[in-house]
Amino acid sequence: KKDTEEITPMPLQRTTYIGYSDASDHGYAMAMITLKDDKMTHVVLKEFTELSVEKDFSVYEYAPSVQAQAVLPQRFIKAQSIDVEGISGATASFDRYRQALKRALNSAKTKDGQRKYFDGIFQGRSRADNHGYGIALVEIKDDRIIGVKLKEVDEKGELKDFETYPHEPSKEAHAKLPQWFVESNSPDIDNFTGATHSTDKYKEAVDNALRKALIERSLPDLIDGTYTAVSDVDSKGYSGASVTIENNMIVEVKLKEYDE
């Protein structure tokens, strides 16, 4: 069917723009578009979970979301608009894609005197270490940070429950730092005593969220998402690597070895 035909790889040049939807406890979407003569010629859509993990639609179990990610790019291109027919059962994904696409298109039409950031809620994550990584949902209005929600993901890929978390400084940092970011209107805050590592992760996550909110920004060399590859096979087996990118930065690498 025409709606699901494959598209050739996107040329990453200044005719390419990226936009992000608002984030919620169910994640967010990203849209990457290429324009030629003011027309959309290529659209790539991605969704990320509330843990800032790209959804792998090759194994994703909810069929309407899989269909939406596959079909909607061509619908947007054909209509040359965000106003297209949605996918039954995937309304939330559809709305996120449309908002991300609208913001990408608005970034292509920047003008003097505009604000620095889109209004909305944007999600960023930090680099991972042996103890996990931080996540920030940053709400922006009129170029001001008006709200911040912080999360931490542990080394098992699960959200930390700060109601029962035993390290008191980390609990206090999680509770107090959102207001510090609001008052600073930036990720540049003092470290929280006894929770330096957590503070650093939150600061990086807030910075990455703000970068997603930018109306005008340069195209990164590395596109957000998770990329997987395997080595050649020899008599002892092979290796695999999974690399996660956020805001032009490698934030996580997972390695595996497989026997022959």
Feature annotation, model-predicted:
Residues 3, 7-14, 18-117, 124-222, ...:
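Active-site- and interface-proximal helix/loop "cap" or "latch" segments in soluble metabolic
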